[in-house]
């Protein structure tokens, strides 16, 4: 069985941006970019799994069905999909707590106007020729992260089951928003516990408001009533508002547990390098100015 490695590196924004993540097989002979670059990263998680299945999930564009950037998800969701055969996630990447709160573990699967089917390729097994180690080498020696706890395994299994049961083709926009709000509820309960009382109600409202606002800008963007730069800036504002509203609902310890960041720390998810590849330099400058 092959090895799948989660890798990450800091983006150009560095201090207030999430890490970019991608996936590489254990030999280093194949990598999947997950919307962005696929070299120069640091390994931070790994597991055994079929590299042929990972490649099937990734698809030729290496985006794993995360069809529209900032609509269905970001690199974290694409990487999680590709890592499915190994049963691991990119949860140790900076900003992952925010991206998973906004897009779920495996992305928004049915959010108009971009469908993002999660083809898990269950019938595919084996390994790519370039991912088969012919001898022991430094590339094959992977530093593994702390093994998942029983609670983490149970939580991840419940998330996979939720995605498997949800039919995006039969779902209305409201169904989709509720599905992702329910995924966030799972994340909250896993990170903070079951007995949250009014805190759980407050966080649910924060998430539902994000879902409504996100859908609003996605529809406007799809109808070409927003330019790419306007959409990205609006998405960044929603991302920051979500963090502000979440921080207002939680104490410092709770915020750290939920989003894996300090109470006053904020990140944005829109990677300038990916925006550059999608929309060009003028859009990057309009969104972020001179980097």
Predicted regions and their residues:
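Charge-rich (acidic/polar
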Residues: 143-291
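Non-catalytic ligand/cofactor/substrate-binding and regulatory segments of enzyme domains
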Residues: 1-149
